[in-house]
Every structure is written in C-alpha cells, then in structure tokens.
Amino acid sequence: MEKTRPASGNAYLTRKGFPGHECVMLTATHKTGGVTFRAGDVVVPLYDDAGALVNVQLINSDGLKRTLKGGQVKGACHIIEGKKQAGKRLWIAEGYATALTVHHLTGETVMVALSSVNLLSLASLARQKHPACQIVLAADRDLNGDGQNKAAAAADACEGVVALPPVFGDWNDTFKQHGGEATRKAIYDAIRPPAQSPFDTMSEAEFTAMSTSEKAMRVH
C-alpha cells in the first residue's frame, strides 16, 4: 500500500472518540468515487477470506467513505484482532468506527463489513471458518430498519445473534452519548440470553398449583 503510513491523531477517529488510535493514513491526495481524499485521511485495508489484500476503504474527516474501483467488496473485510474470548466469540460490525468501539469495549475480535449489504456474505464466511464460535452482529439501529433487518438475516444464516444499540444509530453513537461503562454494559446486556420463564420447564397448570413460596423460588 503505497502513499500510506501508520499514525495516530486522525481527525475522523478523534471525532469518533479515538484520538490516540493508530491507523493507516494517506500521505498524498487520491480521488475515487467522485471524492478527493487527502493526506491524513483513514485507509482501511480489506482482505479476502484467504488473507489477501483485495481493496481499501478511504474515509475522510467528514466521514465520507469510498472503496477503490475494481477492488473486491463482497466477502472482503478488515479484522481488528482481540485477545479476549479468542476462538469463542467473534463480532461483525458495519463500519470501522463501530468495530473500533466494540473492540475497545470488549477486547474481542471484530470484523468490519463496511456496509449492511456485506453482512450476510461475511457472516456465512465467518461461520465456515469458525464453526465453534459465537458470532455476534453488532448491528446499526436504523430509522428505516435496514440495519436491523440485514443483521437479522445474517444472524439467521450463521446461527448468530444480533446486538442492537439502545439508540438509533450505531454502537459508536451510543459510546459518544453515554460513555464507555454504560455502553459496555449495554452491549453485553444485548447478547445475554433471556431469563428462563418457569413455563419453559413446566405447564401453566403445574405452576398454578404450586404454593406461593414455591412460585417465588421458581421466578427468582
């Protein structure tokens, strides 16, 4: 990747809450998709499932994003490696800043899908490569429902789960609005299995016939 260098202090990532994060940045102007990217803009390397570099995503200080014409997008991703839950849980997020947020809060590995359109193919590839992993779609909560719907379809395809942020937008929006601790709690709450109802293990008639103290024990 010529005309790039690793550095921190990127304007876009600073706005997203990560001023000290080191990323790959442009060192020269590059025009693609009708947008002129400048030195200091983010470069997100994208790899296929074999680990070959197949494209990059460029992000300017305003958050405009483009991939290079002719490069692979479907099934391509950027991976932020984590040490916690390695081999046990894998996250997939739409955007780079969202993925950074999830990684920062969990310490776990996160795949960057670039867009909701790529979630399905990426989730399927992830399941093939990691058959024993829990796969979590760190979805966007869109006003039009697009992020939620595509994440749900991807989760169905890979037998994964969806973690929706409590606010409209993405997990980075939650992070900026509510801070790290509250967002960390929200993200783990989103993937916690629901409490088992007493009716899951007995009939309603059996539950009704129990004494008040027995019911209390069952519910709590």
Language-model segments: residues:
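Generic structural "secondary-structure junction" signal
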Residues: 15, 20, 26-28, 58, ...
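Generic hydrophobic, helix-prone segments enriched in Leu/Val/Ile
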Residues: 1-4, 21-23, 56, 77-79, ...
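Phosphate-handling DNA/RNA-contact segment within nucleic-acid enzymes
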Residues: 31-133
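TOPRIM metal-binding catalytic domain and adjacent DNA-binding surface shared by DnaG-type primases
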Residues: 1-41, 84, 193-200
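The Walker A/P-loop phosphate-binding site
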Residues: 197-220
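Exposed alpha-helical structural elements
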Residues: 8, 12, 150, 170, ...
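TOPRIM fold recognition
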Residues: 88-91, 96-200
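Residue-level preference for alpha-helix termini and adjacent loops
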Residues: 67, 79, 95, 167-174, ...
